[in-house]
Amino acid sequence: MANEIITPTEGELKTIIDKTAAYAAKLGESFENKVKQREGHNAKFNFMKEGDQYYPYYRNKIVENKAKIQADAAAAAAAANPKTPSTTTTTTTTTTATTPLPTATATTTSPTPTTSSTIVPVPQTNSTQQLQQQQQQQQQTTPVFEKPQPPPPPPPKKEPTQPDPLLYILDVPDFMTPLELDTIRLTAQFIAKNGDSFFMELASREVKNSQFDFLKPTNHLYEWFRALVESYAQIIYPPQGIKEQLKSNYFSNKQTILERAMNRCEYNQLKEIEEQKKEEREDEEKTIIASIDWHDFVIVDTIEFNEDDLDDLPQPRTFDQLIAGDTPFGGSDFDNDGHGSNGKGGQDMEMEMDMEMEMDDEDNNNNEDEIEESSLSSTNTTGNLPPKDQSKLKIVKDYQKSNSSVKSNAPTKLTQLCQFCKQEIPLDEMQEHMRIELIQKQQRDSRLGGGGSSNNNNNLTNTLTQDDDIARNLQSFASKRVDIFGETESSKKQDEQPTQAPKVIWDGHSGSIPRVQAAQQAAQLAAQQAAQQKAAAIAAQQASQQQASQQQQQQLQPPQPIGIHHHPQRHLPPGMMPPGMMPPGMMPPGMMPPGMVPPPPFGMIPPGMVPPPPPGLMIPTAPPGLMIPPTQQQQLPPQTNTSPSSSSSIKVEEPQSKKLKIDDVLIPESVWLQNNPNPVNLTVEMADKSNIYQITLQPTDSISLLKEKIKELNGMPTNKQKLQAPGLSILKDTCSIAFYNLKSLAIVTCGQKKKGGKKK
């Protein structure tokens, strides 16, 4: 059944099989491979695949067509070269066929009967020769059907090599319009002919023209444009010997040109196949990655932990122990003796380890008797340890444990940095150290260069300190000797930098959670108190500075006597006026004499009148025996000097008093809560005086809760409310009632925020 040939029915499929077999027999396996690559996905060409039902029929048709081609070739060759002996043989065969055979058989086979009884016998020799010739002629004329030989194996397929680059053929981008193509081609021709100078001029002149954007290196058509320029340049200015190269066999032989074209085609196809396979591999990888269930898992092994396994382990160390460097020794020996990791067992082990280290240092100085005594004492003191550890322990008598944490009371020596060895040397040893360093330097220089006069001079110049080193040394010396040079700016900055509070870190144990929380709360409270104290100190300093400036101003303007409106010019001789003053009769209408102030309009405070001074300011009193008029008691002393400097000083001082902030002098929130723990009844007054509300809150409640209460009463959104208390700035939502020191019956004004306006 495997070799059974199934003939397809008459139709399109049979026609395709017959034509394909005919071409395959004529062109060989290369044609079959190309058809398989090109029509591999076509179902009509499945007969070319092994295992198909029509594959044996297809192979048989190929064999038949090859045999037919060979027979036609042999016949054509015979017709081209005719032979004369073949014609003679055919004539002899026809004549011999008509001659009768000898003996009686000849009489019986004769076509015409004879009447005579006598027959002329034919010679035997001639008849045998004719029979042999007839047999030879029949053998020559009868066609011999030989079994067709299989075709020779095709030559090994040649791998395609990388072809030469195409210098004069460029692929035109698909997205390019005909106008852009013509513009780029014409520009490339001119640039290839005229050079880069023309390119630079054209690019600078047409920089704003959108049609010449391809001249910019950032454009997507710039690379294609440069390749086009290079191609045109090679055509306009061809290389030397190009004509002889074109006349060579490499370009004139058609077979060579065809092979080169086939190589380029196969190379391009191979590249496309590789790119396609690469894309398929990438798609497969993406598909595999997308199909992975990242939440899936497989149990490899199960490890069971029993409570008995934890008995031999030491107790977990806390964060403080890790920082302190304590290493608890937990083991079965100490547990059996009843010593914990932090108990006596750990101390004994630590002492024994220190003894062993000390003994190793003094091993060369001890005698054998001392070693024996120490070994005996070690066996007596360490009876609880295993025997294998007793032989290693060495105890020194009169041992004193060195404590690195205890600082020596000896006074610290002053040191100085050596410029040669870069080490801190005591001042009393500095001279000897420098002498040794200089000697060593001279010896080293003499070994290297063999010392001469020039070398000595160089050594002397090298030992001198440079200017920048001198300045640096003096600066460091001044920073260390504050008692001589005073405090420098760097030391002040270091002192002003606040010390960073230790970070509160949880060690992971559940038992230390309350301690960590308490430490964190204490740190936050301390930071808040420090900030409030700093703000209060700054506010107090500002208030004291302002009070001092106001007192200084009042001292510069002492109160005048009763005749405050009278000027010193009254002591001049009669009939004389001070310079720049006109007589009263010659004053223009509406003007008052000097020293006289016109009365202010009704309802306005005179210019000299000011509100009562703030608390803490002292109003200067008149000298003994003088009385200030009642209208001048709440009036600051007038300024007799009318120069611009005096007026400008008053204008500078007024905004400073207006911008005085009271938020900085508030009592800390924690202190306020301790003194006022009761609920607070606030009076909320609308800015337009329309409504007044009474709201009761706790001192710890925030301002945002107060806004919610106001929203419930009048419906105003919380983000539109602007709350302000007397003497305070706008109340912030995140702060509490106690933060602003609001007591009961305090008045809070509720206004509406305005967007887009200038801040006042």
Curated annotation (Swiss-Prot):
Ranges of biased composition (kind: Low complexity)? 77-147, 374-385, 454-464, 544-557, 629-649
GO biological process, alphabetically ordered = mRNA cis splicing, via spliceosome; mRNA splicing, via spliceosome
Q: Does the keyword Nucleus apply?
A: yes
Q: Which SMART domains match?
A: SWAP, UBQ
Q: Where are the SURP motif repeats?
A: 16-58, 183-225
Where is there biased composition of kind Acidic residues?
360-373
Q: Where are the transmembrane segments?
A: none
Keywords assigned by UniProt, alphabetized: Coiled coil, mRNA processing, mRNA splicing, Nucleus, Repeat, Spliceosome
What GO cellular component term, any one, is given?
A: spliceosomal complex
Q: Which residues form a coiled coil?
A: 259-290
Give the UniProt subcellular location, in the record's own words: Nucleus
Q: Which superkingdom heads the taxonomic lineage of this protein's source?
A: Eukaryota
The record's section on Pfam families has: PRP21_like_P (PF12230), Surp (PF01805), ubiquitin (PF00240)
For this chain, the family text in UniProt reads: Belongs to the SF3A1 family.
Please give the subunit comment from the record.
Component of splicing factor SF3A which associates with the splicing factor SF3B and a 12S RNA unit to form the mature 17S U2 small nuclear ribonucleoprotein complex (17S U2 snRNP). Identified in the spliceosome 'E' complex, a precursor of the spliceosome 'A' complex. Identified in the spliceosome 'A' and 'B' complexes. Identified in the spliceosome 'C' complex.
Role this protein plays: Involved in pre-mRNA splicing as a component of the splicing factor SF3A complex that contributes to the assembly of the 17S U2 snRNP, and the subsequent assembly of the spliceosome.
- What is the name listed in the Swiss-Prot or TrEMBL entry for this protein? Probable splicing factor 3A subunit 1
* Source organism (scientific name): Dictyostelium discoideum (Social amoeba)
